């Protein structure tokens, strides 16, 4: 009988090396599925109405320039009941807000994945609404961020600059949305998990001169949830596609270290909730294990749930019949428990 492995802040000396050894013995490596066909579509009317630009004026980030390729939204699913859209060439980053009828004061900056080559809109965005918004009462702010390989002036730091600005914007306008400014977390998936972990470890890094008062608001998340996250850029567990998009074809060793969030964990890193499937062959579970170990070493409160099956990119709707289906309920309970955690 398969059982879910839940790990809280307890010693786990052999967990990382043991699973890493199994990974090597099995001869597994990240898989890259063939790209499915895609065709043009649009964001929904509600998504368009819920847009919140990150930057004032022309909407461009400080020092950035307009891209030649306009933003586009593409659909990959032939089933209208199960959309699988993505967006790329984001030039003017923005949030899409999803507000509950009965907000509980908590908010999540949601950062979907896409290997830093695209941003998925549904399985790690709109599909979260029933569990987190309608049932959980959490206000979601889903980020459409700039991608690092599309020619932006700030290159690999473009996504982090957008994430910092998004967190600051939510906090600065918290009263407008019925949000407690001390209960704003970040939740990232896959490459979006790398960006969320980067925000949680590099929230105070200055990436550009402040443009306005919002840029002086603290960007530290009060807590972070990382779901099958890309973490390491240096070793066998690296997701090669995300690293190539972020750092190029042959990055220097110091650059790979700089963009590996486990290298930047401190005691001030926010409390963390980790979710991963042990059979993930795209982003190996060692990514979560490495981050868990770094958090434990720094004394950061951490809760980790490792499920036996689920593969990669399961989100919510890919967990039917699996023990991984429990993760949204566990996440909501953990978010509620953060009321008692001091920043």
Regions found by a protein language model. Name each.
Residues 72-82, 213, 229-264, 270, ...:
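Mobile cap/lid helix-loop segments that gate and shape the active-site cleft of serine hydrolases
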Residues 105-113:
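Short beta-strand element of the alpha/beta-hydrolase
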Residues 165-238, 256:
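Primarily recognizes the serine-hydrolase "nucleophile elbow" in alpha/beta-hydrolase
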Residues 274-276, 280:
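Short beta-strand/loop motif that positions the catalytic acidic residue
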């Amino acid at each position: 009988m398969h059982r879910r492995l839940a790990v809280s802040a307890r010693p786990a000396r052999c967990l990382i090396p043991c699973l890493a050894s199994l990974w090597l013995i099995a001869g597994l490596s990240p898989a890259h599925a063939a790209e499915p066909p895609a065709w043009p579509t649009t964001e929904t009317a509600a998504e368009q109405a819920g847009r919140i630009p990150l930057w004032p004026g022309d909407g461009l980030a400080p020092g950035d320039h307009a891209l030649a390729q306009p933003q586009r939204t593409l659909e990959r699913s032939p089933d209208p009941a199960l959309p699988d859209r993505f967006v790329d060439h984001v030039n003017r980053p923005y949030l899409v807000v999803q507000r509950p009828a009965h907000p509980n004061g908590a908010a999540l900056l949601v950062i979907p994945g896409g290997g830093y080559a695209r941003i998925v809109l549904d399985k790690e965005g709109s599909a979260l609404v029933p569990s987190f918004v309608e049932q959980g009462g959490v206000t979601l702010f889903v980020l459409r961020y700039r991608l690092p390989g599309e020619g932006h002036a700030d290159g690999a730091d473009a996504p982090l600059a957008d994430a910092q600005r998004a967190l600051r914007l939510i906090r600065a306008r918290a009263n407008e949305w019925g949000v407690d400014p001390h209960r704003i977390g970040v939740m990232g998936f896959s490459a979006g998990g790398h960006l969320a972990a980067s925000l949680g470890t590099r929230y105070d890094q200055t990436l550009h001169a402040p443009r306005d008062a919002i840029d002086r608001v603290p960007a530290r998340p009060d807590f972070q949830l990382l779901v099958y996250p890309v973490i390491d850029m240096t070793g066998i567990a690296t997701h090669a596609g995300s690293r190539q998009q972020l750092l190029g074809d042959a990055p220097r060793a110091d650059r790979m270290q700089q963009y590996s969030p486990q290298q930047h964990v401190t005691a001030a890193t926010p409390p963390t909730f980790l979710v991963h499937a042990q059979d993930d062959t795209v982003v190996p579970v060692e990514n979560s294990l490495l981050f868990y170990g770094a958090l434990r070493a720094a004394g950061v409160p951490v809760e980790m749930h490792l499920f036996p099956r689920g593969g990669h990119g399961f989100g919510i709707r890919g967990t039917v019949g699996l023990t991984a289906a429990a993760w949204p309920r566990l996440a909501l309970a953990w978010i509620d428990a953060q009321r008692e955690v001091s920043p």
